[in-house]
Amino acid sequence: ADFDVFIVGCGPAGISAGLSSIQHKLRYKIVEQEDSLGGAVYHYPRQKIAMTAPVELALIGKVRFAEVQKEKLLEFWQDVVEKTGLKVAFRERMESIVKEGDKFVVTTSRGSYSATTVLLSMGRRGTPRKLEVPGEELPKVMYRLSDPAQFEGQAVLVVGGGDSAL
């Protein structure tokens, strides 16, 4: 196999898995369809408070954030990536996974790779599920909200849910 572990997504879980891979001297590949790390947190509105629990990160140690603004959390993760040399293939989208014997063949937008293990750490926001209704591609239809202030005083319709919907 090309890799011991193939990691899809570079949010908190993907970063943690990559760090553990380095610590255990595993051959790994992380692919992220977006152009930056952070997963769903990257798409939170500006200054949104992210609630986190203390965690132990491989190579880093104990991390304690109770409430932290999105930007500070992303900055922390970027520092972790730089300090540890974590390698991430940005703008590479996973397209399929096929089991072949004792390994998996993962096809992405850039090629095919074989791996002993595949970890799907893409969270819930990777690619929005569209409703397949007329008008969903119109200019005023949005799938991500980065600055709620631009809609202040306006009527909006939110379709979907989750703790980051509003």
Feature-to-residue mapping (PLM):
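Glycine-rich active-site loop/strand segments that organize a redox cofactor
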Residues: 39-76
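Structured core of small recognition/catalytic domains
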Residues: 2-4, 18, 56, 64-65, ...
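FAD-binding core/adjacent interface of flavoenzyme oxidoreductases
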Residues: 1-3, 23, 36, 43, ...
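Rossmann-like dinucleotide/flavin-binding elements
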Residues: 1-29, 37, 144-166
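Flexible, glycine-rich phosphate/dinucleotide-binding loops
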Residues: 14, 37, 50, 97, ...
